Amino acid sequence: MIPLTLKDLEEQIRICRKCRLWKATLNAVPGEGPQESKLALVGQNPGTEEDKSGKPFVGRAGKFLNKVLAQNCINRETVFVTNIVKHKTPNNRKPFADEVEACAPFLQRQLGIILPKKVVLMGAVAWQTPRIKGIEYIETVHPSAAMRFTKMRKRFMEDFNRLAQR
């Protein structure tokens, strides 16, 4: 059965066993935000704090992201926030290609249900997100990279500033 709502799809994500990652995690992290979101943010994969809570971007990178959203008058509660990979990776390593492949259809279905006007892809792994015609995609750096590197922080801030201006 093809899920018709985000809630239906969330349940499928929580019970997914298509790759090895579920074995060493506490929670799948499907994403959160309203089904009628006009903006979606896509990261790489959940970290430790996200694995504990089952919610995306609640750790240090999430706090930084929230600050940048607020500075640009973007209310996080109106945005759908998720990752291309739905489980934490061991030692926060970059997801392997087969892990991205296993999760990408979930993300594509999420975006197909929401049909946001814009999707911000944060980081090189998220840039692999399959595109849906009619949605504008914006590629930027991941918030964790923006926190560590001045040049990337500048780009991240500029990208969100441009997003808020559109």
Question: What are the residue ranges of the model-derived segments?
Answer:
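A polyanion-binding, active-site-adjacent surface
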Residues: 1-166
